[in-house]
Structure formats: structure tokens, C-alpha cells
Amino acid sequence: MDDDLTEYAPDIPDNVLELIFSYLKLQDLRNCSLVCKSWNRFLNDENNEVWRAQCMQKLSPDAFKTDLLSVVPTYKAKLRAFFHAWNPYDCSRHVYIKPNGFTLHRNPVAQSTDGSRGKIGFQHGRHAWEVRWEGPLGTVAVVGIATKDAAIQCHGYYALLGADDQSWGWNLVDNLLLHNGDAHGIYPLLNNAPKYKVGERIRVILDCDDNTLSFEKNYEFLGVAFTDLPDKVFYPTVAAVYGNTEISMVYLGPPLDG
């Protein structure tokens, strides 16, 4: 950066920064946040006009018509969630992503199990996202993680997520943990653990530092589901069989402890 600009950069008023930054792309905004403390402070306000404008440009108006994004209260958090949402190019051919960008719809195709992965995978750090099932579960409704090598569609009604060594899942229908084609016990470890009810919020917690996968239901931590995960890139993934069922996923960022 020019020496003169470096000298005066911290003194640029917020209203001028807002005007300048409103013309920039996201990558440019990230670079600007590294220029000086003043610019970093301004961009750390996740609800300012710059992030609101970016959010309005990228997200469909449909995304704001429900309470789906209420779990990510700031504009920047909503924008981040959008970039982590379901990937329309990495899902079963029987699935489409609705205009809101966060909800998948499974078409009523007989004898098929269909899934979808998120746009961004994780190999480092701690990550949490919320999944909400709308509509009947059918015989298979699995939520979890998968690598890019895991199948995303198969013939028949089958617990596809957890069917091989590239995916790990929790079947909400029978509370079984699934991996490598095997059931790994009932989850959570409770006597007569309650079954999932449509509309309940499932929070998936992937800890790439401790190599574990855990779940919460309605903000109650259910315990660690899987340990000793391999050092691979994992994507938020679901698998469903019921026609016209809809599944929403909202990325939350690092989980809050406690």
C-alpha cells in the first residue's frame, strides 16, 4: 500500500469506509480487514451496512421469509451460512435446492435413497451446523458427515449415509449410529431415548482437532457419537427416502461451549 495512504488509512471516517467498502468484493473486504486496526474494527461489526448490502446481494429474499436464519443473527453470519449451504451440484439427481438456498427438496421417486452435501468441507478446527427435517422421515433419515468419495444416491431404501468407510451418520428413525455399513449402537445412550420429531433442531458438531462427531437436539447436548475420525475433509451430509421431504441446513461456525 502507498505510504501516504497507509498513514491516513486509520483516520478515514466510518461513513466514508462504508461507501468505499460497499463497492468491494468479499475477498477485497477480507484484505481490507488486514490493512489496519481501524478497518478491522469497522469490518468486525457484523451488522453494519457493508455486510447488510453483501447479504442482500447474495441471498434470495426467500431466505428471510421464515425463522430459518434466526440462529445466525448477524448479516455476516447469514452470509457465511449461505456459502456453507447445500451444494446444488453435489446432490442426488432426485434432489433440488429451493430458492432460499438453504433447503433441499427430495422429489417423490420410488426405490431411491437420496442425499446432499454442503458446499464447503472441513479438515481443521471445530464446526457446527443446524439441520431441520420438514415432512415425514420415512424408513431412513440420516444426518452426519461424508467425504467427497461417499455415494450420494443409491437404488432402494437404504441407510446410504454410513453405508461405507467414507461416511458417518445418525439415523433419526431408529436412533442408530451408522458407519462402514455397520450399526454402532443406539444414540443417545439413554433408556428409551426419544425419537426425533419433525421440526426439531438437530445441531451437528464436528471437532476436527479431537476427531469427534457429536449432536445436540433442541439445544441439549447428546454426547459424542463418533471418535477417532480420520484426517480427511468432511462435508455436512444427509440422506432421505421420503418423497417431498425437505431438509434445511444452516452453518453456525465454531460451536459455543457450555
UniProtKB/Swiss-Prot annotation:
Keywords (A to Z) from UniProt: Neurogenesis, Synapse, Ubl conjugation pathway
Domain F-box: residue ranges: 6-54
Record-linked PANTHER family: F-BOX_SPRY DOMAIN-CONTAINING PROTEIN 1 (PTHR12245:SF7), SPRY DOMAIN CONTAINING SOCS BOX PROTEIN (PTHR12245)
Subcellular location: Synapse
Descriptive protein name: F-box/SPRY domain-containing protein 1
B30.2/SPRY domain sequence ranges: 64-256
GO CC annotations on file: neuromuscular junction; SCF ubiquitin ligase complex
Family matches, as SUPFAM superfamilies: Concanavalin A-like lectins/glucanases (SSF49899), F-box domain (SSF81383)
A Pfam family reported for this protein in Swiss-Prot or TrEMBL: F-box-like
Purpose: Required in the presynaptic motoneuron to down-regulate the levels of wnd and restrain synaptic terminal growth at the neuromuscular junction (NMJ).
InterPro entries given in the database record: B30.2/SPRY, B30.2/SPRY_sf, ConA-like_dom_sf, F-box-like_dom_sf, F-box_dom, FBXO45-Fsn/SPSB_families, SPRY_dom, SPRY_FBXO45
Subunit structure: Component of an E3 ubiquitin ligase complex composed of hiw and Fsn.
Family listed: Belongs to the FBXO45/Fsn family.
Pathway assignment: Protein modification; protein ubiquitination
Main location class: other
Organism: Aedes aegypti
Gene Ontology biological process terms in this record: negative regulation of synaptic assembly at neuromuscular junction; neuromuscular synaptic transmission; proteasome-mediated ubiquitin-dependent protein catabolic process; protein ubiquitination; synapse assembly involved in innervation
